[in-house]
């Protein structure tokens, strides 16, 4: 679901449900377990064992931006303008076909993964499969990612080339 599971929503669960597994968890409770959103169905067609192996090659030390603003205007609208001012970031058209998008994910070391319809996004998981490092805003629903290579931030203005390369 794209809906954030809040305390209010969680408290409406029927008593016959002892454990609730969900994406986009926004409330902490023993009976509410966050699970990953995973990759988008259309992206899976481009994913092969060979592609994953090729992703181990050297990557450009840049922050890659490729996302639609309309899926979460509040979290995304300023990001393209802000990061286009830096030589360590690169922006691409969000209408790339899946092959070109997959190639780009594999090419760059860091990928900006702003929240979309939900907090967890397919882009986070596609980035991990491509062997690159997702960069996303910190949230409870993403707490299960703390032991894998993900760069978290509180405010996008905290993201600097030095911070990215220091944290990975």
For each predicted feature, which ranges?
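Nucleotide-sugar donor-binding catalytic core of glycosyltransferases
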Residues: 1-152, 163-168
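Short helix-start
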Residues: 155-157
């Amino acid at each position: 679901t794209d809906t954030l599971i809040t305390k209010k929503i969680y408290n409406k669960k029927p008593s016959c449900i002892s454990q609730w597994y969900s994406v986009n968890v926004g409330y902490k409770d023993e009976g509410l377990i966050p699970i990953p959103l995973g990759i988008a169905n259309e992206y899976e067609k481009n994913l092969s064992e060979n592609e994953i192996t090729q992703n181990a090659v050297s990557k450009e030390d840049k922050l890659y931006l490729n996302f639609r603003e309309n899926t979460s205007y509040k979290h995304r609208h300023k990001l393209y303008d802000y990061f286009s001012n830096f030589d360590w970031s690169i922006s691409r058209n969000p209408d790339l076909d899946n092959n070109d998008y997959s190639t780009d994910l594999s090419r760059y070391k860091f990928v900006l993964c702003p929240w979309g319809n939900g907090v967890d996004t397919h882009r986070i998981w596609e980035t991990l499969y491509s062997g690159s490092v997702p960069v996303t805003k910190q949230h409870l629903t993403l707490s299960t990612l703390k032991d894998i290579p993900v760069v978290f931030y509180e405010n996008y203005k905290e993201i600097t080339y030095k911070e990215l390369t220091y944290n990975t």
